[in-house]
Structures are given as structure tokens and as C-alpha cells.
């Protein structure tokens, strides 16, 4: 026989459960999405006195998210989009190419690889452009408001004089690349086609033999260039001294499969400068070559992320090159402690440090000129060319100044 106290206890228990169902905020119930954590990676090193303070844009490769992080790894803003490349704009919007190494096989992103999109701070779409082919690897909003990007260009077999190519290379279309500049109305203002500037038999330092071997053998197309970076030449001391090759507005381009960095004259559209390197066998792959801007330590030099997968066998490094003498001014090489088989980037910071995005591992770290790691963030997944922004870069960023 149940006692009165037992009955009262049971009634109280039921009342508490019912109250909980009505009082617990709906965002915490199982029927709704679980709240997103404030951080999904880990800051393992942070020397506040030596690190350059700012915000880090961290595109996640492995799920549709781009994070804006503070120096402690806290996620300050989150865009729910896949990004092969993402750039924060001065108005707080995000300029994006979809189709990352993960997203190119996931809906809806795999069907959006011809798109360039701009999202506002809240993640709402505010502008888009659909290209004629796949947009890939790199883009940027120019000071004049136009957008510069890389475009895949497939050249059909019947449009090429195949007698000038190796017999095995006459069996497939050739993949080349173009650089395109459009205005906000989507009108093309300038374009450059690599196949108009170079002979099909030229493959840079690597030579064209790789196209005929093993896994690199021609499949649906001859992957001739595989450009992965395009950057404008900024104002610089070399041009000020009269060297026309480094005229501001010229383009620094990385045809990855050539293992060669080139500069293209914007007016003549000719290749006016090349660098293949000689350090430890020369460039092997390579990403993100760009000239350090005026006012930053090393101004005028060119930084290159050398992946090192094939020539250097699993060891990446950063090169800082004097583009006139072609001498190395600085090298970051720590053997197998630093390696990203694909992708990757680096950025010279105002205090002289260098931010490095080791994309394949999801690690982003900042080093001093003496190679001391003074900030390090390890994400749960891979990333795609993370970058640091000043607190005053955009109006929304100011709220997070420390």
C-alpha cells in the first residue's frame, strides 16, 4: 500500500518535469538545433606581447562554415557557407568561391562552382555572378569595386594544333586558365588567357613530361596549368626605381603544375617575369605568391608557399624572394614539422611576423622572423587559406578590439 508521502513525491516529480518542459528555452530542447559552441578549435600558443593582435578568418574545409576568430579561438561570427576561397570585405561582407575540396562533392555547393557570391555579416546573399565555367582557387575585390577571379578554360582537341604536342597529349582537351575582371553588373572589364601567352609545349620548371606519367596521365583533360593564385602587384620600390615589370596592377600568378611563379603585364598581356627557385631543388607545387606591400617589413619582396610534396618529400617551406636579384631574403624551413600537401598561404604582418595557413592540417600559426611560434590555432578540420585582419578593418570588427 502506497503512503501519502509517496503519492506526494510522485506528484511533485511530475510537476517538476512538466515545468521543465515549458520553462527550458526551446533552443536547448532536442527538437531544435543544438547551440553552436563558441569555439571548435584550440589556441595552443598565444604570446600576447609578440603576436600581432587581430581577427582571423578561418574557412572550414569539411563542412559549410567560415569562422571569424579572435586571438583566443572564440568564434565571433559564422557564415554557413562552403568556401574554396573566402575574403572579408571592408564593409563586413564575405566574398566567396564555393566548391572546396570537400564542398565540390556535396550539395548544393557542387552545383555552385560557377558562382561568385557575396554574403553580408548575417549570412544573407547580397550579390552573385555566374561565370561561363568553373571559378576556382582565388578571387578578390579590387579598389575600383570590380572583382578579379580565376576561371577554368577547357580547350577542345579540335581547336588546337596537335602536331606541336607530344602524341599522347593529342588525345584529350587541354585545361588552361583565365583571369577575369568584372564590374558589379557582371560585365567583363578585362581578361587574360594563359594559353594566349604561352606555348602548349611549355610547362615551366616541371616540363610537360609529368602529364604522360602514372597518376598524372591525361584523363578527361590535359591538366596543363592548374593556376591557383592571382594577386595584383602593389605600389613598390622596384617600379619607383624604373623597373616596368613590377608596375602596380600587373598580376602575380601561380600555375601550380608549372612549379613556376609568373608576372603578367596588364597592358601587353605578356609574361614579363618568372621564378622557379633553386632552394632544395626549386619550387614543388606552390601557392599564394604575392608581393609584400609598402610599409610592411620586407616590402617589395615576394612571398611563396612551397608545398614540397614531390620534390621535397613531405616538407613545406616559405620563401621570401627579392624579385630583382632573385635571392632569398628569408626562408622558413623546419623539416617535417611543417607540411601541407595542397593549398596553404602566408601573410606578412605589420609587426614583421608571418601568419601561415597549413591548410591540410587545419593549423594556422604566427611566427617571428626568428621562427618562434607566438600564436597557433588548431582546427578540428582542414582550412582554406586563413588570414588575419585588423580590428579596424570593418565596422563590425571594431566591436571585438582587445
What feature does the model see in each segment?
Residues 2-13:
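Bacterial N-terminal signal peptides that target proteins for export
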Residues 7-8, 25-31:
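Membrane-proximal basic amphipathic "stem/tether" segments
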Residues 12-23:
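Bacterial N-terminal signal peptides
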Residues 28-402:
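Histidine-/acidic-rich catalytic cores in large beta-rich domains
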Amino acid at each position: 500500500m502506497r503512503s501519502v508521502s509517496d503519492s506526494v513525491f510522485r506528484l511533485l516529480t511530475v510537476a517538476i518535469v512538466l515545468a521543465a518542459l515549458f520553462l527550458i528555452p526551446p533552443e536547448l530542447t532536442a527538437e531544435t538545433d543544438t547551440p553552436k559552441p563558441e569555439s571548435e578549435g584550440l589556441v595552443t600558443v598565444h604570446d600576447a606581447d609578440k603576436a600581432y593582435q587581430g581577427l582571423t578568418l578561418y574557412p572550414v574545409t569539411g563542412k559549410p562554415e567560415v569562422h571569424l576568430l579572435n586571438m583566443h579561438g572564440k568564434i565571433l561570427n559564422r557564415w554557413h557557407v562552403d568556401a574554396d576561397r573566402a575574403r572579408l570585405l571592408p564593409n563586413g561582407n564575405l566574398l566567396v568561391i564555393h566548391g572546396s575540396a570537400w564542398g565540390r562533392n556535396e550539395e548544393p555547393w557542387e552545383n555552385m562552382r560557377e558562382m561568385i557570391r557575396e554574403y553580408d555579416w548575417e549570412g544573407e546573399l547580397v550579390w552573385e555572378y555566374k561565370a561561363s565555367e568553373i571559378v576556382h582557387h582565388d578571387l578578390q575585390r579590387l579598389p575600383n569595386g570590380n572583382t578579379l577571379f580565376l576561371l577554368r578554360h577547357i580547350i577542345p582537341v579540335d581547336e588546337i594544333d596537335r602536331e606541336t604536342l607530344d602524341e599522347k597529349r593529342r588525345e584529350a582537351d587541354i585545361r588552361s586558365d583565365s583571369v577575369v575582371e568584372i564590374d558589379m553588373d557582371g560585365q567583363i572589364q578585362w581578361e587574360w588567357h594563359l594559353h594566349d601567352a604561352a606555348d602548349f609545349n611549355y610547362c615551366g620548371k616541371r616540363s610537360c613530361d609529368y602529364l604522360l606519367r602514372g597518376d598524372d596521365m591525361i584523363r578527361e583533360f590535359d591538366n596543363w596549368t592548374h593556376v591557383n593564385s592571382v594577386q595584383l602587384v602593389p605600389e613598390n620600390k622596384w617600379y619607383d626605381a624604373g623597373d616596368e615589370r613590377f608596375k602596380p596592377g600587373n598580376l602575380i600568378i601561380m600555375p601550380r603544375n608549372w612549379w613556376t611563379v609568373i608576372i603578367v603585364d596588364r597592358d601587353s598581356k605578356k609574361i614579363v617575369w618568372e621564378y622557379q627557385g633553386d632552394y632544395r631543388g626549386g619550387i614543388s607545387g606552390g601557392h599564394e605568391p604575392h608581393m609584400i606591400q609598402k610599409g610592411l617589413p620586407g616590402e617589395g619582396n615576394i612571398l611563396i608557399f612551397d608545398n614540397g610534396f614531390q620534390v621535397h618529400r613531405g616538407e613545406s617551406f616559405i620563401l621570401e624572394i627579392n624579385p630583382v636579384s632573385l635571392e632569398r631574403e628569408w626562408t622558413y624551413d623546419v623539416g617535417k614539422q611543417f607540411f601541407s600537401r595542397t593549398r596553404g598561404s602566408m601573410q606578412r604582418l605589420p609587426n614583421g611576423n608571418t601568419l601561415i595557413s597549413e591548410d591540410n592540417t587545419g593549423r594556422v600559426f604566427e611566427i617571428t622572423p626568428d621562427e618562434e611560434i607566438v600564436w597557433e590555432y588548431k582546427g578540428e578540420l582542414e582550412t582554406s587559406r586563413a588570414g588575419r585582419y585588423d580590428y579596424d578593418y570593418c565596422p563590425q570588427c571594431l566591436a571585438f578590439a582587445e
